[in-house]
């Protein structure tokens, strides 16, 4: 860490590995804070995704991280992604995963998804002062530099009763209808 501690995280462009985290919301402290079931669900989601979706052999998991901060300095949105899986494709190098154990309100879950849209829309200026420059999406310039599109967001609803999952999925789908990023809403069994 040392010399890199004050610098922003490196982009994935350096060899299909996610940048190291400066802080992590996992481990013994997270379990003591009551986040143990959430951590187990995140791990279960990563395993389910690799066992089902990646089993076809068309895509390959090269790395993953949990609790990845996607803060954009003081001016932009700040959110922590439950899991980021490095699954390089032609248009994107990662998949983003948000899990809901059924504990978030419908409004809060919809706001989290909307925060991803804000993050995708945040732009930065590139060019010398006094020249004709251009703006680029922050995520494309500084984080996922080999991606043509903002990474797909998977919202995974952790298993409870089937009718409750279906109701929650339908409600979230209605709440985020028309959003400008790709959002897949599913439960762990249907992943």
Locations of regions flagged by a protein language model:
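Electrostatic, structured charged patches in enzyme active sites and in nucleic-acid/phosphate-binding
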Residues: 16-191
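Accessory beta->alpha helical hairpin/"wing" motif in late/C-terminal subdomains of nucleic-acid enzymes
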Residues: 1-23
